[in-house]
Each structure stands twice: as structure tokens, then as C-alpha cells.
């Protein structure tokens, strides 16, 4: 007899009800809970899966390159980046009739899907110029994906499985990851920029055929070996340089010009090469700092154990943290997710403010899509960090090992942490909403002059300190006499000051009362999300209400009818609630960014400045006004090339609304419904010839909530993605 799913849990495989399937799916990735799992085997499986993960990523990027080379218009776009709309791929099956064929063929021989990914700009910036090069890149990544799949399989074979001690050798891992993963990859990227991208931007082709014979700098390596490095910064591209040609180009490869290339409005390639070289040096040095074979360098345990403030106010300090972090994968994952979440959000900010790719800042829809995309990913990563932090407290935390150290002391004064976060959230919520509602009321009664409008003075001061002249604060970089200005005047400052005060760039946008209010609304969302997540993690082991909570695991619905009030207090419930707040907050962040930019791009920043001070302004002048391209994507008379986004907009709403069906009605309702359907099925001729192997039962409360949350999240994001793309491309096509 075939073994039933799931093979990793004999107890579940023998369950006679449909919960076998749902619990099987729910615990498929909870590797440490699987039958017969040892710690060593767990580490080995996770390690091998990393190769598979990388293979999938490279296969995906290979597909992007292949489809653009095959069905896109990359070469045409390269010849005129500002006037050509980049194509992602053709639409194979335009079965919606003649009007669809026309709508999606606009200016092309066949119907196509326009790309808003920024890939064209990226490939162009790093030196791609022809479809042939895209094909070669695609095949290269395909081969790399194959190698990684084989490597993943290989590391599961008994001979090639690393030992547990190898996984827990922190110093070796730090050295290799810092110098190898971060240092040498940055050095390799510097090499690519210097040898391929910079020459390409000056009209010089460097490919596999000539890269060994084309020196990136006329002086060769002589300045490097003689210590005369400034030669590499001399004669940079001029302000009149025409990208992709030799006109106005220089010879510099490592510069500190500051600001943007005047034509492409992106960072200077030679500045970026210099930046990556500096990062490479820092990380390669950092990767030689930790003590391994030679008895020299830092030892992490010694460093952590020595971190005990002499006043004794932090107790045992960091004693015990080395063992705790080394032995807890959840703690390590939580830290990694938090760092990656911050980095992803920073990527969202810098992608538009300090645009690295040629002509990206002229492609408004792509900029909006990339910002929104990265902020949502950052939100999921940050919530995941806290979720695994909570799992760490439930499964991996050892009170004896951490006695009186910073971790234990944090748990001991969790009430102070939670109540302070609660106070901050209440303060932000009541004051911000109070101001919005006041402004709404006076505007509704025809007295807009009675609005309470705050000038964001501190933020303006920070902008002025960075060189923004419009506020006339005359401080630091905004003052020509400041020592800070004098220090950078010969190097990067002129380029930076030109960029920060140029109305055509996104660097430090002018702000006012609307920005002040929405900033505090976002702060409210961030603090409430943090409050829920922090409370969930700090109360994960136990609380006054339920001191033995850790014995129930990470996710449990309630402790039966016997203990009233124990529903909704598992660490998983905190994650569940925080997800809604996270999505809510990122909604505010992306609404703010998109609306402010829409008005700037449209030459009407006054609309944002006036309407963003009250809630009706947001609903009417941002959401409703900009949804018109989606509402008019198709009608009884036909359709246009935005109709696909209209359908996605509707479909997103449908998925989102379906979520509430699972979120509002609880398990008993579904169980009764299922029992009624079973009764009807068993009494229906012909239908009752079909029997089920598993007795149908409703999802558990936790599972139904998960299904609801997934629908809510997916629907919410699909709806807003369609809105951003259609409203922006409809206006600025």
C-alpha cells in the first residue's frame, strides 16, 4: 500500500480526516518537527535547499533575458530609450477579439506586454547593447542554475554532507561570507563596471572577443602599482557627455563627482565603480578579522562575553548570547530577515532618490512599480523577522544559559517596553487622526482657512543641512561659508548641490504640512505594527494570563473551554494581526510616494500640497481620481491597452473580499456547512457513488485565518499593483 501524504509525519499520515492534508501542507516546511529529524540532518537539508533556491532565481532571471531577447525590443529601445516603450514579451493568446489585438499591438507588429521592471535600464547601464548579448547572458545563467542544482543534490549525498561542527564554526563562516560573498562579489562588480559598463557608456564595445586586449584606462596598471591612484580619477566624463557615445567622454574610471549624469539623470558610473571598490576593500579586510586556524584575530565568544558594562546595569551583559545564537536557527533567521528587510526598504528609497540606472527616472511607471515592489517585500521580511524571533523564544530559548543577560533582562521588563510602545502609538494615533478629522470638518463646512497646518521645520532643517537651498535656512551644506561646504567643494559637493536643488530630480523633495501629517500617520502604522510584533515575541513564552504558554507551541487557537480568555494570544496570532497592520502601513507609504510623485510629474505639486491635509482629499484626489483609467479600461464599446490592468484591479478586489469570508465566519459555521453537504452528497443518486478517502472536516481556526490572511494580502497587493501601473502609465505613457 502506498504511503499516504505526509511522509514526514506518521501520526498525520494515519489521520482519517481531511486535516491530514491541511496539517501536512502547514507543517511541510517545519523541518525540525518532522519524524526522525536530527539536528545535523536539519542543517544539511536547509544548506542543500539554498542551492535549489539560487538555481530557481537564476532560472527566473535567465527567462527574463531570454524572453526579452526573443520577443522584446531591446535593440530598438537602446537606439532611443526615451521614446520607446520596453516590451516584456508578446501576448500569445489575444483571444479577446479584434479590439484587443489592436489595443495591445500599439506600434508593434504583434500584441505585447509592456515591462515596468526596470530591466531594460539596468541591462543598458551595465553594458548590454544587443539581443545576442542577452541570449548569451541567458544561457550563462541557465548553465549556472544547472550547476547549482547539481551542487544541491551533491551536498545531500553522504560523502558530501557537511558536519554539524562545520555549520557552527561562526568565525570561518564570517570570514568567508564577509570577504567572499560581500567583498569579492563587490570587487567583481567593480571589475565589470570598469572593464565593460564604463567603456560601453563611452561607445566602446567590450565583449568576450576583446576584453583581454582592451584596457579600461589609457595608463593601464602603472598608476596602481606606483601608488599614483589619482590618475584614475582625472579627466571624468564632461557634463555634455552623450551616453553610449564618445562625445564628451573622458577616461576616468574611479571618481567622486557627486550628483547625476546630466543626460541620463542617473548616478555617474565611475562614482558607482569607486563605491563598489571601497565596499570591496572594507569587506575583504573585515573577512580577515576573525580567529580561525592561525590563532590571531577576534573570537566572537570572547567579544560577547566581554560586553559587560562596568556599572553592572546590564547584569551579565552578552554572556550566553554566543551559544544562544549559534544553536538557534530561528534566531539567526530572524536577524537575517530584519537586516534584509531594512536593506530592501533602503533599496526602495534609493532606487528613485539616487537613481543608479540610465533613464530610469524618466520612466515614471517603472519607478513607481519598483518603489512599491520593494516596500512590500521589506514589510513581509520585517514581519517574518519578528515571527521567527517569537518561534525562537518558544522553541530555542534557554533561561539557564541566558540567566541575567541582556536577553533575559529584556524579557523581565517587557511590560515597560510594551506599555511605552502602546503610549507612543496612542499619542500618534489620536493626534494625527485628530488633525486630519479637524481639517476634514472645516473643509467640509467651506472654511479651509481654519485647517491646522504644521510646517515640518525639523525635517526642512535636515534637508537644508544636506544642501537644499529653497528653505533659506543657511545651515551646513546650504551655507556657502560653512566649513562642511568648504571641505567637499573640490570633490563631490558641486555635483551633489546641483542635484539636490534641481527640480527635475527626486533628491529631497520639497515638503509641507501634508507631508508632516502623512509622515505621522506612517509613524503610527510602524509603531502599532512594532507593538504587536514585539508583544507577540515577548509574551510568546508566557504571560500573567497564561504562564505556561510556551508548552502550547507557537500557534494554538485556545486552551479549550476550560480556560476562558486564552483565545487569540498565541505568538502566531500576533503575527497574524501584525500582517494587517503592516499591509495597512505600507499602503500609506506607497499612497504617499505615488501621489506626491504623480503631482510632481504632472507639473501640479500644488494638488498634493492642498488636498493631502485632509482624508477626503486622499480619497477623492488620489484614489478616486487616479482610478479612472482602471474604470475606463473597457466598456460596451470596446477596450484599450489598460484593460488588462482593469481586470487585474477587479480580480484583486475579488480575492481580497474572499479573504473576509474566512476571517469573519469561524470554524463551527464551516463544520456545519460541510456536514450538511456530506448529508446531501450521500443521498444524491450517482453522486453518492463517489466516496472520499478522508472524512471531510473544516479547517482549524488557525488555518482558516491563514487562508483568509493570504487572500487578503494577495488581493490587496494585486489591486494596488494594477492601480499604480495603470494610473501612472495611463497619464505618462
Curated annotation (Swiss-Prot):
User: Where on this chain does phylloquinone bind?
Assistant: 670
Q: Membrane topology for this entry?
A: Multi-pass membrane protein
Q: Name one GO cellular component term.
A: photosystem I
Entry's Gene Ontology molecular function annotations = 4 iron, 4 sulfur cluster binding; chlorophyll binding; electron transfer activity; magnesium ion binding; oxidoreductase activity
Q: Where are the transmembrane segments?
A: 46-69, 134-157, 174-198, 272-290, 329-352, 368-394, 416-438, 516-534, 574-595, 642-664, 706-726
Entry annotated with the keyword Membrane:
yes
InterPro entries named among the record's database cross-references? PSI_PsaA/B, PSI_PsaA/B_CS, PSI_PsaA/B_sf, PSI_PsaB
- Report residues binding chlorophyll a B1: 653
**Does Transmembrane helix show up as a keyword for this record?**
yes
Question: A Pfam family for this UniProt protein?
Answer: PsaA_PsaB
Q: Under which main EC class is this enzyme filed?
A: oxidoreductase
Keywords annotated in UniProt: 4Fe-4S, Chlorophyll, Chloroplast, Chromophore, Electron transport, Iron, Iron-sulfur, Magnesium, Membrane, Metal-binding, Oxidoreductase, Photosynthesis, Photosystem I, Plastid, Thylakoid, Transmembrane, Transmembrane helix, Transport
Recorded hits in PROSITE patterns, A to Z, give: PHOTOSYSTEM_I_PSAAB
Which cysteine pairs make disulfide bonds?
none
UniProt EC number: 1.97.1.12
According to UniProt, the reaction catalysed is: reduced [plastocyanin] + hnu + oxidized [2Fe-2S]-[ferredoxin] = oxidized [plastocyanin] + reduced [2Fe-2S]-[ferredoxin]
Q: Name the Gene Ontology biological process terms.
A: photosynthesis
**Residues holding [4Fe-4S] cluster:** 558, 567
Q: Which residues bind chlorophyll a B3?
A: 661, 669
Principal location listed in the UniProt entry: plastid
> Where in or outside the cell is it found?
Plastid, Chloroplast thylakoid membrane
Q: How is the cofactor bound?
A: P700 is a chlorophyll a/chlorophyll a' dimer, A0 is one or more chlorophyll a, A1 is one or both phylloquinones and FX is a shared 4Fe-4S iron-sulfur center.
Tell me the subunit arrangement: The PsaA/B heterodimer binds the P700 chlorophyll special pair and subsequent electron acceptors. PSI consists of a core antenna complex that captures photons, and an electron transfer chain that converts photonic excitation into a charge separation. The eukaryotic PSI reaction center is composed of at least 11 subunits.
Q: Which family does it belong to?
A: Belongs to the PsaA/PsaB family.
Query: Can you name this protein?
Result: Photosystem I P700 chlorophyll a apoprotein A2
Species, as recorded: Thalassiosira pseudonana
Amino acid at each position: 500500500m502506498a504511503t499516504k501524504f505526509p511522509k514526514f509525519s506518521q501520526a498525520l499520515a494515519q489521520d482519517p480526516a481531511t486535516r491530514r492534508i491541511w496539517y501536512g501542507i502547514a507543517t511541510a516546511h517545519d523541518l525540525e518537527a518532522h519524524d526522525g529529524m536530527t539536528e545535523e540532518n536539519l542543517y544539511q537539508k536547509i544548506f542543500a535547499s539554498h542551492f535549489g533556491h539560487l538555481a530557481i532565481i537564476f532560472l527566473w532571471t535567465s527567462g527574463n533575458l531570454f524572453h526579452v531577447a526573443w520577443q522584446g525590443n531591446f535593440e530598438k529601445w537602446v537606439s532611443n530609450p526615451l521614446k520607446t516603450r520596453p516590451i516584456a514579451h508578446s501576448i500569445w493568446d489575444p483571444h479577446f477579439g479584434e479590439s484587443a489585438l489592436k489595443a495591445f499591438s500599439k506600434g508593434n507588429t504583434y500584441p505585447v506586454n509592456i515591462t515596468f521592471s526596470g530591466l531594460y535600464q539596468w541591462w543598458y547601464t551595465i553594458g548590454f547593447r544587443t539581443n545576442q548579448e542577452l541570449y548569451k547572458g541567458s544561457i550563462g545563467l541557465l548553465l549556472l542554475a544547472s550547476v547549482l542544482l547539481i551542487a544541491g543534490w551533491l551536498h545531500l549525498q553522504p560523502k558530501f554532507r557537511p558536519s554539524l561542527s562545520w555549520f557552527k564554526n561562526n568565525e570561518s563562516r564570517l570570514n568567508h561570507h564577509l570577504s567572499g560573498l560581500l567583498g569579492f562579489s563587490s570587487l567583481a562588480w567593480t571589475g565589470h563596471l570598469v572593464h565593460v559598463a564604463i567603456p560601453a557608456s563611452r561607445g566602446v564595445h567590450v565583449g568576450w572577443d576583446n576584453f583581454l586586449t582592451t584596457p579600461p584606462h589609457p595608463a593601464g596598471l602603472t598608476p596602481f602599482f606606483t601608488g599614483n591612484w589619482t590618475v584614475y580619477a582625472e579627466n571624468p566624463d564632461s557634463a555634455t557627455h552623450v551616453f553610449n557615445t564618445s562625445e564628451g567622454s573622458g577616461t576616468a574610471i574611479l571618481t567622486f563627482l557627486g550628483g547625476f549624469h546630466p543626460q541620463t539623470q542617473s548616478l555617474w558610473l565611475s562614482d558607482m565603480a569607486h563605491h563598489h571598490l571601497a565596499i570591496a576593500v572594507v569587506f575583504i579586510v573585515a573577512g580577515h578579522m576573525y580567529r580561525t586556524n592561525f590563532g590571531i584575530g577576534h573570537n566572537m565568544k570572547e567579544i560577547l562575553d566581554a560586553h559587560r558594562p562596568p556599572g553592572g546595569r546590564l547584569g551579565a551583559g552578552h554572556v550566553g548570547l554566543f551559544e544562544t545564537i549559534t544553536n538557534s536557527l530561528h534566531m539567526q533567521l530572524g536577524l537575517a530577515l530584519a537586516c534584509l528587510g531594512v536593506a530592501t526598504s533602503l533599496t526602495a528609497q534609493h532606487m528613485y532618490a539616487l537613481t543608479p540606472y540610465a533613464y530610469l527616472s524618466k520612466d515614471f511607471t517603472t519607478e513607481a512599480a519598483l518603489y512599491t515592489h520593494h516596500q512590500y517585500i521589506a514589510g513581509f521580511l520585517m514581519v517574518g523577522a519578528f515571527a521567527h524571533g517569537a518561534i525562537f523564544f518558544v522553541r530555542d530559548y534557554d533561561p539557564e544559559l541566558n540567566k541575567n543577560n541582556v536577553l533575559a533582562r529584556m524579557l523581565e521588563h517587557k511590560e515597560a517596553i510594551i506599555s511605552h510602545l502602546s503610549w507612543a502609538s496612542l499619542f500618534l494615533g489620536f493626534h494625527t487622526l485628530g488633525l486630519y478629522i479637524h481639517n476634514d470638518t472645516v473643509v467640509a463646512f467651506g472654511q479651509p482657512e481654519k485647517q491646522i497646518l504644521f510646517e515640518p521645520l525639523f525635517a526642512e532643517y535636515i534637508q537644508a543641512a544636506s544642501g537644499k537651498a529653497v528653505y533659506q535656512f543657511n545651515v551646513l551644506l546650504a551655507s556657502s561659508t560653512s566649513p562642511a561646504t568648504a571641505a567637499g567643494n573640490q570633490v563631490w559637493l558641486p555635483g551633489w548641490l546641483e542635484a539636490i536643488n534641481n527640480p527635475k530630480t527626486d533628491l529631497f523633495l520639497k515638503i509641507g504640512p501634508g507631508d508632516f501629517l502623512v509622515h505621522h500617520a506612517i509613524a503610527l502604522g510602524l509603531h502599532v505594527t512594532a507593538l504587536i510584533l514585539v508583544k507577540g515575541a515577548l509574551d510568546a513564552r508566557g504571560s500573567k494570563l497564561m504562564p505556561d504558554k510556551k508548552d502550547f507551541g507557537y500557534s494554538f487557537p485556545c486552551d479549550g473551554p476550560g480556560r476562558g480568555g486564552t483565545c487569540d494570544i498565541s505568538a502566531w496570532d500576533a503575527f497574524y494581526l501584525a500582517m494587517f497592520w503592516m499591509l495597512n502601513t505600507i499602503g500609506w507609504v506607497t499612497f504617499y510616494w505615488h501621489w506626491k510623485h504623480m503631482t510632481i510629474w504632472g507639473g501640479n505639486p500644488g494638488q498634493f500640497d492642498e488636498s493631502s491635509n485632509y482624508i477626503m482629499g486622499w480619497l477623492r484626489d488620489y484614489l478616486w481620481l487616479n482610478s479612472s483609467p482602471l474604470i475606463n479600461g473597457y466598456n460596451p464599446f470596446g477596450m484599450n491597452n489598460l484593460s488588462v490592468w482593469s481586470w487585474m484591479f477587479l480580480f484583486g478586489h475579488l480575492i481580497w473580499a474572499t479573504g473576509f469570508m474566512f476571517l469573519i465566519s469561524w470554524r463551527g459555521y464551516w463544520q456545519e456547512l460541510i456536514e450538511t453537504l456530506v448529508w446531501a452528497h450521500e443521498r444524491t443518486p450517482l453522486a453518492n457513488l463517489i466516496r472520499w478517502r478522508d472524512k471531510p472536516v473544516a479547517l482549524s481556526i488557525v488555518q482558516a485565518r491563514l487562508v483568509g490572511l493570504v487572500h487578503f494580502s494577495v488581493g490587496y497587493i494585486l489591486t494596488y499593483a494594477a492601480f499604480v501601473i495603470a494610473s501612472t502609465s495611463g497619464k505618462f505613457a
